Curated annotation (Swiss-Prot):
It comes from the Eukaryota. Binds 1 FAD per subunit. Catalyzes the reduction of glutathione disulfide (GSSG) to reduced glutathione (GSH). Constitutes the major mechanism to maintain a high GSH:GSSG ratio in the cytosol. The amount of GSH may affect the determination of cell fate. Its EC number is 1.8.1.7. This is Glutathione reductase. The active site is at H454 (proton acceptor). NADP(+) binds at A187, I190, E193, R210, R216, G276, L324, V357. Belongs to the class-I pyridine nucleotide-disulfide oxidoreductase family. The keyword DNA repair does not apply. The keyword Flavoprotein applies. It is found in: Cytoplasm.
Amino acid sequence: MSSTNHFTYLVLGAGSGGIASARRAAKHLNAKGNGDRIGIVEVTRPGGTCVNVGCVPKKVMWNTSFIKEMINAAPSYGFDFGGQQVKFNWPTIKKARDEYIKRLNGIYDSNLAKDNIVRINGYGRFSGPKEIQVNGANGEKYTADHILIAAGGRPTVPDVPGKELGITSDGFFELEDLPKSTLVVGAGYIAVELAGVLHSLGSETTMVIRQKQFLRTFDEMLHTTLLKQMTDDGVKFVTEASIKSLERDVDGKRIIATTNAGVKLPPVECVIWAIGRVPNTDDLGIDKAGIQLTEQSGFIKVDEFQNTNVPGVHAVGDICGNFLLTPVAIAAGRRLSERLFNGKSDLKFEYENVATVVFSHPPIGTVGLTEQEAITKYGTENIKCYNTSFINMFYSVQVHKVRTSMKLVCLGKEEKVIGLHIIGDGCDEIIQGFAVAVKMGCTKWDLDNTCAIHPTSAEELVTMV
């Protein structure tokens, strides 16, 4: 094997976790000046799901829908458009959004080059326990002292007749115009977010969910509040149903979905599959490396330090299946590099009290245990919950109202806050600071002992009784 084909650290996948780990490794290895080499293998644009077809472009579209809601609220605040209707142009924001993503791709490439990280263009697969072959059986082979698998995941598409008539969340970002009507199939945060954006921008939106509720792993207060708000806002729901087939209508322009009960739903212009994601482990040559996968979902099995069962092979991010969140992949990747290349042998990412946000309408912020999880873990007698629900002051002069609801889940006599769940305008920003408090072990008294900022929604979290 040529010395140019051997690396100290070789990363498979230039997504958020892979790049973060590679750059942190470069920081330490480059400083040592021992000639250590770092490489990263990627077949497409750098940035992974988050930058290209996930968090970043999604947030741009959420911002777009937020502006639309502000326009709707403007007359209540005395703004007169002179009888003119404000028009929304989807191609304009799509062009601006796509250009922004390309700039980010360029920044990632530039940062990799600055850190002397070798970019290997192509699709990498294991050809042995510590060997990666790029671009097929006749492709170049690379070895490394340490290999990181950070190849991410992809949307799931059900195996039903006509499945190709639907698109995934990836395809959402390829839409050239706003569909007049959309059917979103799924009950997770991706389904909820896309349905909210499309409805706010003017697409007649229906959600199909297998059970009575969506966001079922979230606290009951959150999904109950959101379901009512989305229903009040005009989103339609088909519950306790799944899609058995898709077909074109008679004119070929719209799509008709048939449920498992044999009910044909009204035709729509667009169907989005948002039923979950699977790890990209099926075409990585995992068997040739002897890497173990989880039995149920095929994620890469790792220990608390992100090690696989093969010495010198590690994994982070969505491909591990533990919190499919960009900040988690970044944090785990950086800690891995600190452990491998900076002597911090005990450093690891702690998968507890990870805060998360759903960019729904209104947004959700949550950290810690749900009420039911807390009761299951500690017993009903040891849990006390504090709740509040109110109309944000922003809606005081509007006919349209959006409710804000908050819950604190507290443990024991000292009332340690082990869960904090909020939904309402601004909750996507509010949650970060309170997540720090929960991570530090704050109690209800710590919140009570904090002077409120008035008038805000956040003050309710420090004034609950």
